[in-house]
Amino acid sequence: MKPDAHQVKQFLLNLQDTICQQLTAVDGAEFVEDSWQREAGGGGRSRVLRNGGVFEQAGVNFSHVHGEAMPASATAHRPELAGRSFEAMGVSLVVHPHNPYVPTSHANVRFFIAEKPGAEPVWWFGGGFDLTPFYGFEEDAIHWHRTARDLCLPFGEDVYPRYKKWCDDYFYLKHRNEQRGIGGLFFDDLNTPDFDHCFAFMQAVGKGYTDAYLPIVERRKAMAYGERERNFQLYRRGRYVEFNLVWDRGTLFGLQTGGRTESILMSMPPLVRWEYDYQPKDGSPEAALSEFIKVRDWV
């Protein structure tokens, strides 16, 4: 089947609505919407929930941008895209909870198509979701990865292991020699066997995110915490900032294509701290995190 960008766009708009409704149901606070237009073509809807009952900040962004020529970040590893017009659309979200025992989560699903007259379109899907705990709970990690595995199974037994490994490899801070969190799923350049199959998988990932995340939020949101846990949470959020600004391809793509900076940087935590040569106390729950986030098979 020929790629249907309109069908993908409608799914993404509905997905943004659904996820915002689900997060509001857990938190009680409403999202504030900011619709924007991109001068060079396209626009989006940015939605932010701030200082809610559970979430310090949650941002759920839909964007649909198009242009006559590809940016350098995209053609660097896909030279065949040079000289083509393009459309890129997606939903991207990050949730930063108040409670340090509730992990931060990130999800993204996207579709890209590049066309020129007289040639077949070049298209692909990408996306995934990943979890960044501050305090490790095995049952949470197992639930997260089991949900990821189960949504992948209808698409093949090799899908989850392949995209789990890709996620582990991608969300890695080379300058720190550590993982950003416990991973999940990451896929990109997905265009085989056909459009319908790839679109169905992207939909499964988009819908699966809240199935994976919200039970963990419910389990941890009422746990008591103090200044020590909060300080550690803010310190570890620094890793999130470092990854997004130094390594993340999506951030670089957005900034290079003249995307909306406020929306691109919406993933940043509202508060964060750095501390020179910080070392957690031996045997403390904080010290245990470095071992917990090392790559392993959770299911």
Swiss-Prot record:
Pathway participation: Porphyrin-containing compound metabolism; protoporphyrin-IX biosynthesis; protoporphyrinogen-IX from coproporphyrinogen-III (O2 route): step 1/1
Species name: Escherichia coli O139:H28 (strain E24377A / ETEC)
Function of the protein: Involved in the heme biosynthesis. Catalyzes the aerobic oxidative decarboxylation of propionate groups of rings A and B of coproporphyrinogen-III to yield the vinyl groups in protoporphyrinogen-IX.
Active site per the UniProt annotation: 106 (proton donor)
Entry's family note: Belongs to the aerobic coproporphyrinogen-III oxidase family.
Pfam families: Coprogen_oxidas (PF01218)
Major site of localization recorded for this protein: cytoplasm
PROSITE patterns recorded: COPROGEN_OXIDASE (PS01021)
Subunit structure as annotated in this protein's UniProt entry: Homodimer.
Annotated TM spans: none
Catalytic activity: coproporphyrinogen III + O2 + 2 H(+) = protoporphyrinogen IX + 2 CO2 + 2 H2O
Cofactors, names only: Mn(2+)
EC number: 1.3.3.3
InterPro entries with a match to the protein in the record: Coprogen_oxidase_aer (IPR001260), Coprogen_oxidase_aer_sf (IPR036406), Coprogen_oxidase_CS (IPR018375)
This protein's record includes keyword Oxidoreductase: yes
Binding site for Mn(2+): 96, 106, 145, 175
Record GO biological process: protoporphyrinogen IX biosynthetic process
Binding residues for substrate: 92, 108-110, 258-260
Keywords carried by this UniProt record: Cytoplasm, Heme biosynthesis, Manganese, Metal-binding, Oxidoreductase, Porphyrin biosynthesis
GO MF entry, a single one: manganese ion binding
Chain segments carrying region Important for dimerization: 240-275
This protein's record includes keyword Transmembrane: no
Protein name from the UniProt record: Oxygen-dependent coproporphyrinogen-III oxidase
Coiled coil: none
Marked site: Important for dimerization: 175
GO cellular component: cytoplasm
